[in-house]
Amino acid sequence: MVHWSAEEKQLITSVWSKVNVEECGAEALARLLIVYPWTQRFFASFGNLSSPTAIMGNPRVRAHGKKVLSSFGEAVKNLDNIKNTYAKLSELHCDKLHVDPENFRLLGDILIIVLASHFARDFTPACQFAWQKLVNVVAHALARKYH
């Protein structure tokens, strides 16, 4: 089990309370698809992903980005039980979708960039440390079924 200090919990929840899930989720998923284009193969049904402009404007990317970040909110609410929080999603991504678990880490790193750009003043090095710890724990929980 991961230990969270009171300061880490406060830094995570403070930033999370300001997050526009729809906007930041769409941006995070779009950035993932643009920066790491091989991840697009998991989203072939999303239609036009031919350019950064097409990806940023794609309504299915926006909708799924919101869904992904909403799910991430469950980690924020359940910091002491992230492994169980993501058990079913881990199974889905492993057994049915066959997503390379490295992509979870990549998305986590992208999320850090999105949060830092949106909340620069709040995103201190201590805050970044807490969020990096969180995205690593989430990525590990999502990859759990693969082990």
Swiss-Prot record:
GO terms for biological process: cellular oxidant detoxification; hydrogen peroxide catabolic process. Heme b binds at H64, H93. Keywords: Heme, Iron, Metal-binding, Oxygen transport, Transport. Residues 3-147 form the Globin domain. GO terms for cellular component: haptoglobin-hemoglobin complex; hemoglobin complex. GO terms for molecular function: heme binding; metal ion binding; oxygen binding; oxygen carrier activity. It comes from the Eukaryota. Disulfide bonds: none annotated. Beta-type chain found in early embryos. Heterotetramer of two epsilon chains and two alpha chains. Hemoglobin E (Hbe) contains a alpha-A chains while hemoglobin M (Hbm) contains alpha-D chains. Belongs to the globin family. This is Hemoglobin subunit epsilon.
